């Protein structure tokens, strides 16, 4: 299955759920792909949303843990499209983690 880290964080933020507890209840041993980006928070509503922001260090370290703990993961997708320089930097950083 595909685990979208930002979607999980958005759900946890908006529903006030502990992220680690939520994540640990998923069948991550069946995950083959991870989507990587950082979520945003809407200023008016205060709700989190999948903003496809540049993946921050917290997200990258979480990805590193997931890759280490779940050997079924084969594919990583950085969901960031705003500028090529930051996309290249995030791809380089992800490669360093694996």
Residue ranges, per PLM feature:
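Short helix-capping and hinge/turn segments at secondary-structure transitions, especially at repeat
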Residues: 1-2, 7, 14
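Hydrophobic faces of well-ordered beta-strands that scaffold small-molecule active sites
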Residues: 1-3, 32-36, 74-79
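Gly/Pro-rich active-site loop or hairpin
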Residues: 11-72
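Active-site beta-loop-alpha junctions enriched in small/polar residues
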Residues: 6-10, 37-41, 79-83
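C-terminal helical cap(s) of enzyme catalytic domains, especially alpha/beta-barrels
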Residues: 84-98
């Amino acid at each position: 299955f595909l685990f979208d880290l930002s979607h999980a964080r958005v759900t946890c933020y908006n529903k006030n759920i502990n992220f680690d507890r939520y994540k640990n209840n998923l069948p991550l041993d069946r995950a083959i792909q991870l989507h990587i980006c950082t979520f945003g928070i809407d200023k008016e509503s205060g709700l989190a949303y999948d903003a496809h922001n540049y993946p921050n260090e917290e997200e990258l370290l979480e990805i590193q843990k997931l890759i280490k703990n779940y050997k079924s993961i084969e594919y990583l997708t950085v969901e960031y499209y705003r500028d090529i320089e930051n996309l290249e930097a995030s791809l380089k950083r992800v490669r360093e983690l694996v």
